[in-house]
Amino acid sequence: MSRALSLLAGAALGCALAGPATAQDAPKGDAANGKKVYLADGCYFCHGRVGQGGAYNGPAPVLAKTEMPFEGFKGQLRQPAQDMPAYSEAVMSDQQIADIYAFVQSLPGRRDPKSIAILNN
């Protein structure tokens, strides 16, 4: 076997043994600090004080109990797909984003209307 073919086979074997690439683990977030950042940076104008969503400048998604993984959440803050302002690393650190993520994960989320007594009388 030629030297080039041996190197190629070795590289392929190394890649196979390395396993699949995984997303970097999210920094551990602090929900209490996340609430402070969420309120201080005005996230609530569009997303509501408890992440319930809203329509301040067009429809804003519900953030409470979001099923979006951290990397997607961070990506949306860094390079938003909609009319949301972008938050560069100079404006908001990855740790602050992790804190906001922890905060919105701590919110109760939507309740089933059938579980609200006043709506069912």
List PLM regions with ranges.
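Bacterial N-terminal signal peptides
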Residues: L8-A16
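Gly/Gly-Pro-rich "capping" loops immediately C-terminal to redox-active cysteine motifs
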Residues: A31, K35, L39, G48-A86
